[in-house]
A protein has these predicted regions:
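Feature detects long, helix-prone N-terminal segments enriched in hydrophobes
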Residues: 1-177
Length: 177
């Protein structure tokens, strides 16, 4: 589970790097419009976005299997790794997205505002995926009756920033640092 969480997390960071590099490459190589290089970069970016989401759902499936097998330690390690090491990703993603979309919407005189929901939806799906891993761990704790976190923690796993506080509270309650 921890390996899959690391792969998913690396994919998230790779997507962030590509979110910066691909548009820059498209601007650099796109002097003559949508040529082969620009299309290739754009297609590569989209393919990597799909791969990151596939890795996320594979991680969720692995968490579900760990839950079914009662592998609390394995699930806790993957969940902890995924939640805590994704904090810088979400901060950088938010800052970059605000900057880029502010510039794009301003430069297009508002026309690009229609595309703003796309990266927001992409990020929300990542949050849902990591939240599903957290829910599997919480369900396992409740199943084993080990210092059960309250049911509110299920919902908190799906809210950015609050999910981190929920994660830390649960880990402290379990005696983890």
């Amino acid at each position: 589970m921890k390996k899959l969480a690391k792969i998913f997390l690396m994919g998230m960071y790779l997507h962030l790097v590509l979110s910066i590099a691909v548009p820059m490459g498209m601007l650099y190589f796109g002097d003559s419009g949508w040529n082969t290089v620009v299309m290739g970069l754009f297609e590569f970016y989209l393919a990597m976005a799909v791969i990151v989401h596939i890795a996320g759902w594979v991680c969720v499936a692995a968490a579900g299997m760990a839950y079914c097998r009662n592998e609390a330690d394995n699930l806790r390690k993957g969940w902890k790794w995924l939640k805590l090491w994704s904090i810088p990703f979400y901060i950088l993603n938010f800052l970059y997205s605000c900057l880029v979309w502010f510039v794009l919407v301003g430069a297009s005189r508002g026309m690009m505002i229609l595309l703003v929901p796309l990266p927001v939806i992409f990020t929300c799906i990542l949050i849902v995926q990591s939240g599903c891993v957290g829910i599997c761990y919480i369900m396992l704790l409740r199943k084993k009756h080990q210092k059960c976190p309250s049911g509110v923690h299920y919902a908190l796993q799906f809210f950015p920033v609050i999910d981190i506080f929920s994660t830390i509270l649960i880990l402290k309650k379990q005696g983890d640092e």
